[in-house]
UniProtKB/Swiss-Prot annotation:
Residues 129-567 form the Urease domain. NCBIfam families: PRK13206.1, PRK13207.1, urease_alph. InterPro entries: Amidohydro-rel, Metal-dep_hydrolase_composite, Metal_Hydrolase, Urease_alpha_N_dom, Urease_alpha_subunit, Urease_AS, Urease_asu, Urease_asu_c. Belongs to the metallo-dependent hydrolases superfamily. Urease alpha subunit family. It comes from Alcanivorax borkumensis (strain ATCC 700651 / DSM 11573 / NCIMB 13689 / SK2). GO terms for biological process: urea catabolic process. Coiled coil: none annotated. This is Urease subunit alpha. GO terms for molecular function: nickel cation binding; urease activity. The keyword Metal-binding applies. It is found in: Cytoplasm. The modification N6-carboxylysine is found at K217.
Length: 567
């Protein structure tokens, strides 16, 4: 029986069971848990390789074979870290397992035929496309930036660089909602829009849901009072949509206890739950310990570094239309920036009490850094806190699964999209990202939308091969024409679907309908469902979880930073 060394095997087919892979320049290592490919019968494309007529490629017609196969990929998802071939059919993940030709190979469940294209996944890591659940739609150019970072779904609100959108993630009213839904047809990005939730009577909120909003946003700049919270959640309960909230920093209409009371145990997504992005000062972080609260962070505080606090003050003044010459405005800004709660946020992410990470794009957040900031946080916690319970010293599989869930499956669950997107699982839209391990979380190689490459690192188009410099991200064929619309989803509410909004607006994108938004709870946040009792000292801002002080030092140096970027 022929054998080959592990190194030679990894070089040819990628790592296999027991092999470890370092994530970029972090201190994080993942280990392959299972290999679904069959030793000796692996498939690989190229001259003298396996996927050729009569060998790894069958004679079957297109109806019985995959449209696209990704070979020998290392999948990193909340459910596992496995080596497998991935079969894609009609834009969806059709199978995860062993690809090839069943006429000559055993155990084939992904059939390759003349109608099949191939992406070589050997040596690459595959993740689900990221989901950014806190978007200010200030400019459409954000979408290219996000896509190039590995994000394939954006959830939020706005209508462009209006003063309202600069500060709040709100697309207010049916007319604005219709225009944004029409604009969504132009982008290779799944989009879902939040209406304005700040009202004390239901009619103006219900009409936004019927117009296409996937949920409502409560923001303090529009007046997040207990009455508006109660009313907004009541409308959401009737329409099976989600509510996102940015609470009252100034405690004008009530304190955190009043806001929690207004929730009445109903599900709500709390944005930037630590509070630097906004929320009851100094103790909105307490909400992360509630069973009905789905807590997320935005990336400016991810992770806590020596520069975090200083950077925030200037950002805050601009984003919330504050005047540095007005003492009250300066005091408002300073009340939101607390080193103690930001430090605690790091640890609460590591322990799974904070469930999601998003950007807060151009409104105190960087739209292209959700993935990177997530893994920087994971690295910082590994360095400062060591291995998590459940991880041996050799690898960080549990921690990696916990952190990847924060920007993939958990926001999908929170916003009723997990039946369509959010993970590398059979039946879901094939929104996938290929990474070289050395560039993991920083610069993806390929971004696949609905089974077709939408963006990629690409060299000089006039060169004789694809790789010569300058190499940068360029839109691919999946980002153009009707192909873009066939591979992209616009999400709306069931009420909007029943009202015929896609037909009324002649929307061209595939339509996804959100569901299960009112039944999802913290316990459903995969690998991120811890419910500690959180307390904040009103004088020192120290945070305790179940009585234990949560504190850590700010990072002075981070991975995934200047080693990869000039600016």
């Amino acid at each position: 029986m022929a054998t080959m060394s592990r190194q030679a095997y990894a070089d040819m087919f990628g790592p296999t069971t027991g092999d470890r892979v370092r994530l970029a320049d972090t201190d994080l290592w993942i280990q392959v848990e299972k290999d679904f490919t069959v030793y000796g019968d692996e498939v690989k494309f190229g001259g003298g390789k396996v996927i050729r007529d009569g060998m790894g490629q069958s004679q079957l017609p297109s109806a019985k074979v995959m449209d696209l196969v990704i070979t020998n990929a290392l999948i990193l998802d909340y459910w596992g870290i496995v080596k497998a071939d991935i079969g894609i059919k009609n834009g969806r993940i059709a199978a995860i397992g062993k690809a090839g030709n069943p006429d000559v190979q055993p155990n084939v469940d992904i059939i390759v035929g003349p109608g099949t294209d191939v992406i070589a996944g050997e040596g690459s890591i595959i993740t689900a496309g990221g989901i950014d659940s806190h978007i200010h739609f200030i400019c459409p150019q954000q979408i290219d930036e996000a896509l190039a970072s590995g994000v394939t779904t954006m959830i939020g609100g706005g209508t462009g660089p209006t003063t309202g959108t600069n500060a709040t993630t709100v697309t207010p009213g049916p007319w604005n909602m219709a225009r944004m839904l029409e604009a969504a047809d132009c982008f290779p990005m799944n989009l879902g829009f939040l209406g304005k939730g700040n009202a004390s009577l239901p009619e103006s909120l219900s009409e936004q849901i019927s117009a296409g909003a996937i949920g409502l946003k409560l923001h303090e700049d529009w007046g997040t009072t207990p009455a508006s919270i109660d009313n907004c959640l009541s409308v959401a309960e009737e329409t099976d949509t989600q509510v996102a909230i940015h609470t009252d920093t100034l405690n004008e209409s009530g304190f955190v206890e009043d806001t929690i009371a207004a929730f009445k145990d109903r599900t709500i997504h709390t944005y930037h739950t630590e509070g630097a992005g906004g929320g009851h000062a100094p103790d909105i972080i307490r909400a992360a310990g509630l069973a009905n609260v789905l807590p997320s962070s935005t990336n400016p505080t991810r992770p806590y570094t020596v520069n975090t606090a200083d950077e925030h003050l200037d950002m805050l003044m601009v984003c919330h239309h504050l005047d540095p010459s007005i003492p009250e405005d300066v005091a408002f800004a300073e009340s939101r920036i607390r080193r103690e709660t930001i430090a605690a946020e790091d640890i609460l992410h590591d322990l799974g009490a904070f469930s999601m990470i998003a950007s807060d794009s151009q409104a105190m957040g960087r739209v292209g850094e959700v993935v990177m900031r997530t893994w920087q946080t994971a690295h910082k916690m590994k360095v400062q806190r060591g291995s998590l319970k459940g991880d041996p010293s050799e690898h960080d599989n549990f921690r990696a699964k916990r952190y990847v869930a924060k920007y993939t499956i958990n926001p999908a669950l929170a916003h009723g999209m997990a039946h369509e997107i959010g993970s590398v699982e059979v039946g879901k839209l094939a929104d996938l990202v290929l990474w070289s391990p050395a560039f993991f979380g920083v610069k993806p190689n390929l971004i696949i939308k609905g089974g077709m490459i939408a963006m990629a690192k690409m060299g000089d188009p006039n060169a004789s091969i694809p790789t010569p410099q300058p190499v940068h991200y360029r839109p691919m064929f999946g980002a153009y024409g009707k192909a873009r619309q066939a591979t992209t989803m616009t999400f709306i509410s069931q009420a909007a679907m029943d009202a015929g909004i896609p037909e009324q607006l002649t929307l061209a994108n595939r339509i996804g309908v959100v569901k299960g938004c009112r039944t999802v709870k913290k316990k459903d946040m995969l690998l991120n469902d811890w419910l500690p009792h959180l307390e904040v000292d009103p004088q020192t801002y120290e945070v305790r979880a179940d009585g234990q002080l949560l504190t850590c030092e700010p990072a002075e140096v981070l991975p995934m930073a200047q080693r990869y970027f000039l600016f």
